[in-house]
């Protein structure tokens, strides 16, 4: 048996001379030197796709075909009409338009959007496509959100919360969070204190000064009592998130406590440096070493009273490693918080009452390996009394709802497939879902009523679809790719089985002139009886002549999905696999145990045993090559 199980580059170097024949088109230089040009040949897909408020334009960052590989992405826009061509925007033009197309928080009536751009806060009129600037400071403001009535915008500045009145422009500070050492009582103690008391007893002038100081202090304290009450964080603690209730009755403060600073970090030598000397890159800590943690405070407004919450219930030994506020319900009566323990084996969902900070656990997910999977952080409010979230509770990432009291848990999707993205429509009538329902090798978009029921498939073309919905929910900007075509922007209607029209073309004409295949996906039998997905490149598929040898490509990145019908993140290797097949090699690309896309058990199959099933799947791949191709 001749099996080459090394890096692809070395495999080609070992190829028999008699097999160095290619079926590549004479119009295309099918050489390693050419295909490894990467983005200069294949192009770079559009990124940061957003819509204009009126839904007429799609904005994105991109470079035109043939642009140098190290050129920065540029701003573009294209009309959301079939046959339109992208228009390049200058950076000053984009700076003017950026607040208009930035993501942000919609007002309750969906007529305005609060956004942040370049550290300042703006409000966008969605009907008139106009922008009102609210702040213009050197301080960085962020996280703008409307209050329940749409009359105020909350935002953050210098790790504190503020509110601005949209009618009169008044800015009010809602929190006074401080770091460092709290001030101490400066009154002298001991001998010096006794001496000071003696002085006031002996001299009228000292008593008069003390009386005036006492009156002034009382007045300062009276005025200070009308302001937000300050409170101090621990040493080494910082503000991570502040989330204000829509009715401004309370806020949640999430802090981060640095632990990784004291952990030992792995080092990688960096040989190519400006100085000419080898330098050290400190890149990451080891699993199980000291890590960051966080805690959550409930702050009553306007009093500023603070209540620290036990976010991991019934356990004082564990601190949450990851805490995120998933939002408040529209009524402002409760917040939703997600917390993952620092061993990554338990995820809690809690509701927190705006009245007193009372915490109610509504869902707990435990995993003996680790919490993960697609859409792991997807959660929010379906309405004022129900929560939606994605969980791997049944072994696959699916959508659930539960009451804010923890009752009435319902699973809205099920099957041996995954919900990879979930979003609630602005009117809260629909879920927009990206799923692998068709097969693990496809990603399509569906629309489903918020209460569950029949899902309507929006996209129909094979491959992967990443959809951004227009503000009026009529159109979709679809970043669509197939196994042999990179992602491009398409436009279509948000309707079942909609037809989409291509608006961008990223690869060079040179690359498009070559016949790139969609590799067949086969299931090979593993030694434990489980079928393992494989992309296969045969010499006959690309016009080559078999040379009796095979190559097994091993994708890296651990938890990655690479066997699918869409464009691979390993696109250079995709082209290289063509190159090998054209020269006679049978190439296998295996989604071994530990890869993404096949549910929780597949994802965690390598837990504490890397080099077990993942390696055996490749050994079984070599047996498949021997059996099917005599290699």
List where the protein language model places each region.
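Compositionally biased, low-complexity segments enriched in small residues
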Residues: 2-3, 18, 22, 566-567, ...
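Sec-dependent signal peptide recognition
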Residues: 2-10
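Hydrophobic h-region of N-terminal signal peptides that target proteins for export
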Residues: 9-19
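Beta-propeller folds
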Residues: 19-469, 474-487, 491-494, 509
